[in-house]
Amino acid sequence: EQQQADDSNKEQLSQQNTDNVNIGMSVELPTEPGKKVTVMDVFFSNAQGKFYALFLVIFAVMFATADIKSGYIKNIGGQVSQRGMLIVSRAVALALFTAITFAGIFVFQAAANMLAFKYVVWGNWREIIPYFLTELTLHYAFVLICMAIAVIIKNNVISMTLSVCLTMNIMSIVYALIDYVGNRVGLHNFNIYKYTVTGRMAMLPMNVGREDVVSSMCVAAVFIIIMLSLSSYIFQKRDI
């Protein structure tokens, strides 16, 4: 019964952003008082608070525009019939970077726990694996969104600013307006936040269920396809 109560408290904490989205970054540990802080606890709180996303988007924006600013893309652009494939190659590189970064973060957090608390408790691996893979996919989709912004705008400062604003829930103002309009036209209890990548990052519970995984993966897949298609099309048509 105590274990069920702990799981229930963690799930309530993980889903608190569904109806109350704050602007800014909020990181709160789900660890129960008197219990050891697990690696999963810290990873969950940072992933939910979009701390990892903030780090990833900085690299994504710089990487997406590096070859354009250096002039390298102009040298090879004329030799490639399908320039959109250059975007696909970037997406593959970003996928590897995101996966390696996530794995490194998890290992680094274990080392940090050892230094800070003098112990390492990983957590429940049945919770860790599905949560880790789902958040990894959502973060990759978010990275591609930021890459698309950088490719379209072609300005590092503006692209970086917009990407950081996304991690800080600035779009919650727009989401609130969309929800209001949706409810006014008869879509009761409509919540656009559930259908966004950043929303799914924040709402994903620690004890993730099959429905959570499927819905989050579907949202991520839709954004991955849209961002890749949009970036490739614009890059193909644009005069470089």
Where would I find each of the regions flagged by the language model?
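Transmembrane helix boundary and interhelical loop/hinge segments in multi-pass membrane proteins
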Residues: A60-R83, A91
